[in-house]
Every structure is written in C-alpha cells, then in structure tokens.
Curated annotation (Swiss-Prot):
EC id: 2.5.1.31
Swiss-Prot/TrEMBL catalytic activity: 8 isopentenyl diphosphate + (2E,6E)-farnesyl diphosphate = di-trans,octa-cis-undecaprenyl diphosphate + 8 diphosphate
An individual GO BP term: polyprenol biosynthetic process
HAMAP family membership: ISPT (MF_01139)
Keyword Transferase (UniProt): yes
Record bears the keyword Transferase: yes
GO cellular component: cytosol
Cofactor(s) essential for the protein: Mg(2+)
MF annotations from Gene Ontology: ditrans,polycis-undecaprenyl-diphosphate synthase [(2E,6E)-farnesyl-diphosphate specific] activity; magnesium ion binding; manganese ion binding
Cofactor: how bound: Binds 2 magnesium ions per subunit.
Protein's UniProt name: Ditrans,polycis-undecaprenyl-diphosphate synthase ((2E,6E)-farnesyl-diphosphate specific)
Source organism (scientific name): Lactiplantibacillus plantarum (strain ATCC BAA-793 / NCIMB 8826 / WCFS1)
Amino acid sequence: MFAFFNKNDPADNTDVQLDPERIPAHVAIIMDGNGRWAKARHLPRVAGHKEGMNTVKKITIAASDLGVKVLTLYAFSTENWKRPTDEVNYLMQLPVSFFDTFVPDLIKNNVRVQVMGYVDHLPEATQKAVQNAIADTKDCDGMVLNFALNYGSRAEIVTGVQKIAQQVQDGQLAVGDIDDATIDAALMTAPLAPYNDPDLLIRTSGEERISNFLMWQIAYSELVFTDVKWPDFTAATLQACIADFQSRDRRFGGLSDHK
C-alpha cells in the first residue's frame, strides 16, 4: 500500500503514497540540529536557527496541506536559557521576525496560532509578537500551529498539579474524582482538545530522547527519529515520517488486530 523512501536522506525525493484517512491528527516535532547544521557549514549557530525558521514556514504549510489538525513545534525549552546570551537573545527575536513575515501566509492558509509555555517570562517584544499572532489568526479554523515556547514538561506537570490541588483546597474537586481527564484539563495542551495528545512525535538530527517534551501527552504516541537536521527537513521528509507512522499497528496497550 505504501512506497517508502529513506527518511534519513533529505536528498531522496521518491514519492510516498499516504492514506488520507490515516493522517495523524496531531504531529509534534522536536526541531533539533540547527547548531550542527551551521557548524558543518562553518557558519555561526544563529545561521542555523535562521534557516530553521524558514523550515518551520515550509513544514507548517506542508502539514496543513496534508490534513494535520495540530502541529506542535518545540521552539524553546525552559532549559534553553542556559545557552550563551547572544544565542538566547537571537532566539527571543526569532518569533518577532517569524510572525511579522509569516502571519499573512498563515491567514491565507487558514492556520491558527496557539502558544503553550511560560510566555509571561519572555521579553516584552516576544510576548507582544505572540499575542498579536494569536489575535490575528483567531478566526482561522484550519490547522492549529502550536508553539511550545519557554516550555518544559516537568514544569507543566507541576503547574497542573498545583491547579488541581487548589481546586481540591477550594472544595471544587474531590480527591477521589481526580482522573486522567482532570489532569488533561490542567495541562497546557487543554486548549487543543480533542487533539491534546500527539499521534506522532518526530525528533530530527539523530538524537533519540524526549528532552522534557510532552511527557504526559506522548504515552501512546508513535515516535520517529530521523537523522535529518531540522534546516534540511522537507515536506518529503515529513511525508516519509507519516508513512512510517501509517505502517505501524497502534495498540494503545492492547493486542494487535493481527494476533
């Protein structure tokens, strides 16, 4: 049913046949490899981030065209503040440049912007760019482009537990009534319902770890790791990752239909 190409080879443009009925509703991507991409070309790390921003634009449109409902991109983690100051300052400027140049295309493609993370800790100009993008695309009802910005899964879970504890303390919730749905509603992905949890998680650049990203939400996600660095990631690479996803038998803890 499917024709695959090597998802580790960005130069391989062999067509991939996808089942349009089995496109993952929520795709999450850990965008990794910008710095190594730049280093391999004897460029400063920020050059990799700039090229990575261009990749975000291309993949956003590609995912929307494929019928993805939510595209979540890990843009900046709570741990990324440990990077060199010049690099952090550049990364904080990227959302401003991105939204200034790309919001018209998002509106044209009916894509709505959502941001999760501790946005109030970001520089004022970055916060303003985020707020404007959300406001400008609020009437779009196609794919949601969800940025994880100053986000960390452990911090998210702590914040969610604090919300639930406050509800219990205020008499709004009984301890015995706390269940999966309670936790889902307390997490930063709640506004994405019913697509809170990624169906497919992709990490680029050959690293095979989760890096404090959506740890509650990926309990039953399919994971695809590709050697392709984020600036080299193309629509064809995305299609190959989705083809890999479609080749799998998702069991959600149960038995395979073939056994």
